[in-house]
UniProtKB/Swiss-Prot annotation:
HAMAP family: MntP_pump. The gene is mntP. The keyword Cell membrane applies. InterPro entries: Mntp/YtaF (IPR003810), Put_MntP (IPR022929). The lineage of its organism: Bacteria, Pseudomonadati, Pseudomonadota, Gammaproteobacteria, Enterobacterales. One of its GO terms (molecular function) is manganese ion transmembrane transporter activity. This is Putative manganese efflux pump MntP. The keyword Cell inner membrane applies. Probably functions as a manganese efflux pump. It comes from Yersinia enterocolitica serotype O:8 / biotype 1B (strain NCTC 13174 / 8081). It is found in: Cell inner membrane. The chain crosses the membrane at residues 3-23, 41-61, 65-85, 104-124, 132-152, 165-185. It is a multi-pass membrane protein. Its main location: membrane. It comes from the Bacteria. Belongs to the MntP (TC 9.B.29) family.
Length: 189
């Protein structure tokens, strides 16, 4: 996977955290910069660890299903993208976004909940020739940036963007999945 695809993937994976941090920022009267940085760090670290875990799981299984790797990566990205679009399209506000408490453990649990898709992406990346450390670092850094920004601007754009950030992220993931499939089919032709 080239640098531009890695960056697109990293920012697509950060959309869940961005949407969650917008909700958290919107729930505070005036989020402080320190609170935004803390939120970004928690989300970023967890989001960087989960694709590594997924990659290890996928690497173990990859020796058994190498000939199906592109279909697996496409399927995971497509399913996760559709899930993100569906979640973004829901009109209900989730309980995690309603909470006013921003304790360490609340942030950790929210970060874990928003990073499970990154673990599944890690499984899919095990079937591709990628540098997982660089990819995980890019995902973590993008998530840290987006979660921090989401906290700071959440009170301003929360009502305007909110869950649409997840829809955008889902569309990007589906696009990456189709790109992986296209590249594989093009190589066979």
């Amino acid at each position: 996977m080239n640098l531009s695809a890695t960056l697109v993937l990293a920012f697509a994976m950060s959309m869940d955290a961005f949407a969650a941090s917008i909700g958290k920022g919107a729930s505070l009267h005036k989020p402080r910069f320190r609170e935004a940085i803390r939120t970004g760090l928690i989300f970023g670290v967890i989001e960087a660890i989960t694709p590594l875990i997924g990659w290890c799981i996928g690497l173990f299984a990859s020796q058994y299903i190498l000939e199906w790797d592109h279909w697996i990566a496409f399927s995971l990205l497509f399913i996760l993208g559709c899930r993100m679009i569906f979640e973004g399209a829901k009109q209900q506000v989730e309980e995690t976004e309603k909470m006013r408490s921003h304790s360490f453990w609340v942030l950790v649990m929210t970060a874990i909940a928003t990073s499970l898709d990154a673990m599944a992406i890690g499984v899919g990346l095990a079937f591709l020739q990628v540098n997982i450390v660089h990819t995980a670092m890019a995902i973590g850094l993008a998530t840290m940036i987006m979660a921090t920004l989401g906290m700071l601007i959440g009170r301003y754009i929360g009502p305007l963007l909110g869950k649409r950030a997840e829809i955008i992220g889902g569309i990007v993931l589906i696009g990456i999945g189709f790109n992986i499939l296209y590249e594989h089919i093009y190589r066979l032709a």
